């Protein structure tokens, strides 16, 4: 606790890094949402599906009906533009977080690490005075301009970025990644037909080189970014590394998010120099004196947030078994591109009285993304089983020109899964009635044991 007390959270520092970070995050959210809309993903992922896989405790978050689902995306566009401009920031920052997080909570089959990262960043933006310079709020005198802000308002974002990198590196210290170069062997092989680098990428040693370098990079890049002496070289490495991963791996916009976000590690002078290139009519600035009671409250909240962010990636250690198999504590733990998992899931609805059963065609109810994700993720399998039970309870079916009514159906599935290039293994035995297994945080002892060979 003595070390914590010595941390000077409230030392004043230039607001410039916070201003640029505000603009960068707003731009990412704006462009990312436009990309999402132009690709037609709103319709494919949030309008067409018949069911959604909500997060435990957030099942009450439901999609809007039909084309109303465009509304939260429009709100993101508006609020992200306002965040960029620093306009009505007190309202636009919370709106950006709420509208984006609402979308992310709808369906875990769309979970991506950088979406989770952006939810955290937009949440933190609510509590920092990122609009107190270079903003329309200042221009229209809605707020008093500030040249400086407390150190924690910038440090909290550096911490969050550090968490992403360091835990991503720690997660790579495992057998599949370092000793088997998986799943990189699989993904790099997909580029073997490239005219320039194809013959190189199919070489096994290249996959091992990428695996080991990726582990070392993630674990230590933050420390080089924090040092003024090595920062420029480290950032060049950030750009090259993330460009290569974007080019070779199915990783979405994550590399671009990290490239622009890590600019916050640069010195205040660096950011001030950027802002100085733009004309800005400065007004008289103020420095706010934070009362001791407020300091204690802020310090407590910061420490609580830090501890929470340290616990979440480590919660998997509370469970037994292979993490890639049971996925207990896998999400929100910054395990970036560590797993290639494929599954084949055949579901059956069985009448409890007649024992007659029918095989389900999953594509009739699920999108391609949902089916792919569900077939390997235990919690989603249970949710799908509950959906099928509700769907077929007391329903009437016509089979071979005969009419049957299903009473109190049980849901069974025969599921085989392959992890990181291994042969497909039995994941869930057909004998289980999946509709009777509660969807909780309890250990998933109903899964078949994992053979790591």
Where are these regions (language model features)?
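Alpha-helical membrane-anchoring segments
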Residues: 1-453
